[in-house]
């Protein structure tokens, strides 16, 4: 993870990334107090603020609960997955981008691309999510579901050029 973060922030980040079994962004709340019962509410709150400062989580402060509501970001998987799964989501996203450049029709359905990659959903989703910002918004299939970051893409030439640049910049 990031060495400049406190030891508690690193443990919290790893815990949350491990808890996201399907590789999708997760939601956490006061259960973190139970999961880290040896820590104070203040120390956990400070560690969460560190994670938020690095863009690894977003925090929503609400009345009542002891801790803010926590939502992990894709950057958390990028930071933690090499240690958790042994796979780097950035390197994996380059593999997926190359598959999409070679066969753009694979982008239509995330499930089809996942099958061709041959990866577990836990490995696939963070890598796939890293490609979403490089596809024009109107060509991204976004129905509400809990399987993938998006259901797929309808790739146009501009998107393929963006993916080629992504591969160039991340290889």
Model-derived features: where do they sit?
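Leucine-rich, amphipathic alpha-helical/linker segments
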Residues: 89-117
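A short, conserved structural fragment
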Residues: 52-63, 132-147
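Short, amphipathic alpha-helical interaction segments positioned at domain boundaries
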Residues: 74-99, 153-171
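Short amphipathic alpha-helical elements of helix-turn-helix/winged-helix folds
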Residues: 11-19, 95-103, 127, 134
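Minor-groove-contacting beta-hairpin "wing" of winged helix-turn-helix DNA-binding domains
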Residues: 64-72, 143-155
């Amino acid at each position: 993870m990031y060495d400049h973060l406190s030891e508690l922030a690193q443990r919290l980040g790893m815990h949350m990334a491990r808890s996201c079994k399907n590789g999708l962004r997760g939601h956490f709340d006061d259960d973190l107090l139970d999961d880290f019962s040896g820590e104070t509410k203040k120390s956990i709150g400070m560690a969460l603020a560190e994670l938020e400062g690095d863009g690894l989580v977003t925090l929503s402060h609400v009345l009542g609960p002891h801790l803010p509501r926590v939502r992990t970001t894709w950057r958390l998987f990028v930071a933690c997955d090499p240690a958790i799964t042994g796979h780097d989501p950035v390197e994996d996203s380059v593999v997926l981008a190359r598959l999409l450049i070679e066969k753009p029709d694979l982008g239509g359905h995330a499930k089809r691309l996942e099958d061709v990659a041959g990866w577990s959903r836990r490995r696939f989703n963070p890598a796939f999510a890293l490609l979403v910002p490089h596809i024009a918004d109107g060509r991204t299939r976004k129905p509400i579901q809990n399987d993938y970051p998006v259901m797929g893409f309808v790739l146009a030439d501009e998107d393929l050029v963006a993916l080629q640049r992504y591969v160039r910049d991340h290889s």
